[in-house]
Design a protein with these regions (language model features):
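An acidic, low-aromatic, low-complexity terminal/linker signal
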Residues: 1-183
């Protein structure tokens, strides 16, 4: 019986190579600015409007507790799509650079070692080696954590409420100014 192979898009973060299931990759985009939202974790950079869909953008370096890096011409955003609980989640992850696409069968993917309770390995799906490289395979389901997305939804709602309040206040002040002039 033939072993099923799965393709992974690999990318770089601080010199390490990571991979995500290519079936979860919607597209790869060059880095472009985002709309920042208030009251969000530092690794959530903000949101973009991609063909009418608002997509949260997460800096994977910061999410993994790595040192921040100034974005450059190699910095890309990988748009990931995942279906969970009858809900489609779409999130962009900012990475240093895209590397390659590799195929791995289940036999070549090793389980991530247990690091103890001090190290969070929940993102790890496994490890795969190709030639002399070790590639860290990420679990997209965990990467697209709904709790993080809830924080973004909440921040978006707060930003929308603040904008509405500002417009109402400006309208009220304008009416009051007109009434004073007409009096």
């Amino acid at each position: 019986m033939a072993e099923l192979e799965q393709e992974y898009l690999t990318f770089l973060l601080q010199g390490e190579e990571y991979g995500v299931d290519i079936l979860c990759v919607q597209e790869i985009r060059v880095w472009s600015s985002v709309t920042e939202l208030p009251n969000k974790p530092s690794y959530i950079k903000g949101v973009i409007n991609l063909r009418g869909v608002i997509i949260p953008i997460i800096d994977l370096r910061l999410r993994f507790g790595k040192e921040a890096l100034e974005y450059n011409e190699q910095t890309v955003t990988i748009i990931l799509r995942h279906q969970a609980n009858d809900r489609t989640m779409v999130v962009g992850i900012v990475v240093d650079a895209v590397s390659e696409v590799y195929k791995f069968d289940n036999q070549s993917i090793r389980k991530a070692p247990a690091f103890g309770s001090n190290i969070d390995s929940c993102f790890l799906k496994g490890l795969a080696s190709i030639e002399e490289k070790l590639i860290i395979l990420l679990d997209s389901k965990v990467l697209l954590n709904e709790d993080d997305l809830y924080c973004i939804d909440k921040a978006e709602a707060n930003a929308s409420n603040i904008a509405e309040q500002s417009v109402l206040q400006a309208n009220t002040e304008s009416k009051q100014a007109n009434e004073v002039e007409n009096a």
